[in-house]
């Protein structure tokens, strides 16, 4: 019996690949070279991926994680057997010390954490955030556009090699999952997500994972011109202390699995993206991570935000319990005379905790979901999850309207929609088995039209879900609950009066279909002449 290790406990494929690369940066023969083509000199010898002059020349602020590892391994010398140079930062007491009674009755230098001296992190776990296409983020921003309330979502995608940085890694975003949340004009509150394990299981079937989170901080400047205020800049703040603490909590929940640490984890690849106004007063996207030091302080629960100054954090003065230990935190800064002085971390600027990660979109958009251009002519869209507050409901009328846009041989296009797949596994009407969902996800990943058509024809759970949607759609959801797509075709299902349009009965399964369909939405067979 083969037991598969969960995705969250495996070394990521991109790390496995990069660990096999030599990382050397090849340099061509230059004008200062005085030797034959096959020879090398100091001007054209390959340089290491952590070479400071090369990084400065290419304007790379932080070396990549694997370049950082190579630098540590190289500093140990060729004869050493040290292969795990990464040591996790610790701000809490080491548990189960045998030398004394548990704290506060006893403490020693072995279990006591060292004084934290904040340093700007010189490397980053992720070197770039690439959002596949503009439609993806526009759909996310629609919630703020319709309600005026801020919104948060999890970035769904995968980690891939980033060729612009030596041994670099990029987070490619293919979809955005919007968890249960309470949204306000000036803030967001996470709510309990009862479907978290189910969603993670779906992501594993799709070969994807949560690579980060995104939130809006948009304030309308001129609604007619579509401009927003420029609020986050060097004279205010980039991330508030509260946002840094939240980012650190999420990074701690998504550790970076690596064989270069004795703990088998070090830091995190989980990224943070902020959607806010830029200098041109248009919505732009800015990427960050918090440092490993920040994540360690949050894990030890010694860091908290200040009340009126978002750019400052504060190290707790009073322990939360008798067993809670607060270590000292300090940082260096220049005083009014230009001299370096040490300051206590009460308060401390969050700029010491941040690592910039460039975020953007490729020149040529890519579509992991809704592949191809055939869907652009469709008038219906499948609603995003957890948007009941603005009247966007999944299932019922929305499912009927969305499904009616596709014939059976177009079921692959219908299923190549992250929010549709998410609804199949999280709806509270019909539970589709993991075996059937795995089969559909494999078809979506491979873009296998034949398998997708077979799934639509053979999956009884899908047939039952559609039957319930037709039953509920005819007498339940009102069309006003479903947002109207501009220039789209009107919904031809149930009307607000509850009357039904023309229907025809399938000669094979007797299902009542809407007029205009050429095949049965239940069994997929063509209409009889």
Curated annotation (Swiss-Prot):
It comes from the Eukaryota. GO terms for cellular component: nucleus; VCP-NPL4-UFD1 AAA ATPase complex. Its main location: cytoplasm. Residues 129-266 form the MPN domain. InterPro entries: MPN, Npl4, NPL4_C, NPL4_Zn-bd_put, Znf_RanBP2, Znf_RanBP2_sf. Pfam families: NPL4, zf-NPL4. Keywords: Chaperone, Cytoplasm, Metal-binding, Nucleus, Zinc, Zinc-finger. GO terms for biological process: embryo development ending in birth or egg hatching; ERAD pathway; ubiquitin-dependent protein catabolic process. Forms a complex composed of ubxn-3, ufd-1, npl-4.2 and cdc-48.1; within the complex, interacts with ufd-1 and ubxn-3. Interacts with ufd-1. Interacts with elc-1/elongin C; the interaction may mediate the interaction between the npl-4-ufd-1-cdc-48 complex and the E3 ubiquitin ligase cul-2 complex. Belongs to the NPL4 family. This is Nuclear protein localization protein 4 homolog 2. It comes from Caenorhabditis elegans.
């Amino acid at each position: 019996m083969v037991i598969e290790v969960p995705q969250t406990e495996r070394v990521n494929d991109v790390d496995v690949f990069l660990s096999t690369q030599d990382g050397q940066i090849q340099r061509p023969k230059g004008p200062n070279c005085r030797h034959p083509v096959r020879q090398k000199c100091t001007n054209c010898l390959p340089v290491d991926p952590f070479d400071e002059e090369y990084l400065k020349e290419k304007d790379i602020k932080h070396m990549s994680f694997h370049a950082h590892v190579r630098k540590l391994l190289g500093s140990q010398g060729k004869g050493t057997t040290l292969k795990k140079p990464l040591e996790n930062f610790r701000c809490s007491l080491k548990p189960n010390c045998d030398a004394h009674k548990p704290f506060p009755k006893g403490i020693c230098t072995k279990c006591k954490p060292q004084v934290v001296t904040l340093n700007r992190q010189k490397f980053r776990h992720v070197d770039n955030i690439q959002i596949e296409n503009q439609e993806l983020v526009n759909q996310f921003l629609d919630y703020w556009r319709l309600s005026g309330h801020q919104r948060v979502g999890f970035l769904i995608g995968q980690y891939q090699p980033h060729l612009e940085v030596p041994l670099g890694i990029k987070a490619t975003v293919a979809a955005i999952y919007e968890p249960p949340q309470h949204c306000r004009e000036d803030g967001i509150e996470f709510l309990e997500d009862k479907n978290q394990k189910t969603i993670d299981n779906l992501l594993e079937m799709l070969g994807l994972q949560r690579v980060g989170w995104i939130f809006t901080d948009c304030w309308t400047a001129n609604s007619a011109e579509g401009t927003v205020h420029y609020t986050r800049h060097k004279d205010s703040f980039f991330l508030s202390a509260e946002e840094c603490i939240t980012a650190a909590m999420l990074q701690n929940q998504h550790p970076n699995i690596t064989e270069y640490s004795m703990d088998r984890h070090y830091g995190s690849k989980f990224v943070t993206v902020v959607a806010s106004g830029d200098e041109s007063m248009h919505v732009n996207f800015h990427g960050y991570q918090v440092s490993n030091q920040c994540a360690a302080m949050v894990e030890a629960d010694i860091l908290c935000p200040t009340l009126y100054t978002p750019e400052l954090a504060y190290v707790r003065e009073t322990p939360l319990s008798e067993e809670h230990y607060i270590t000292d935190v300090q940082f260096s800064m220049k005083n009014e005379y230009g001299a370096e002085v040490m300051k206590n971390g009460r308060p401390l600027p969050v700029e010491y905790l941040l690592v910039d990660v460039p975020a953007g979109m490729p020149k040529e958009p890519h579509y992991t979901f809704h592949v191809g251009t055939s869907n652009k002519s469709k008038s219906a869209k499948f609603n995003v999850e957890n948007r009941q507050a603005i009247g966007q409901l999944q299932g019922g009328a929305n499912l009927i309207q969305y499904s009616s846009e596709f014939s059976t041989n177009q079921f692959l296009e219908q299923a190549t929609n992250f929010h549709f797949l998410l609804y199949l596994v999280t709806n509270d009407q019909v539970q589709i088995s993991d075996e059937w969902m795995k089969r559909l996800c494999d078809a979506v990943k491979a873009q296998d039209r034949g398998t997708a058509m077979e799934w639509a024809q053979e999956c009884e759970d899908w047939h039952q879900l559609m039957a319930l949607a037709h039953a509920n759609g005819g007498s339940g959801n009102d069309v006003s609950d479903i947002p109207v797509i501009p220039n789209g075709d009107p919904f031809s299902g149930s009307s607000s009066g509850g009357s039904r349009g023309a229907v025809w009965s399938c000669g094979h399964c007797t299902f009542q279909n809407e007029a205009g369909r050429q095949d049965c939405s239940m069994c997929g067979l063509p209409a009889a002449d």
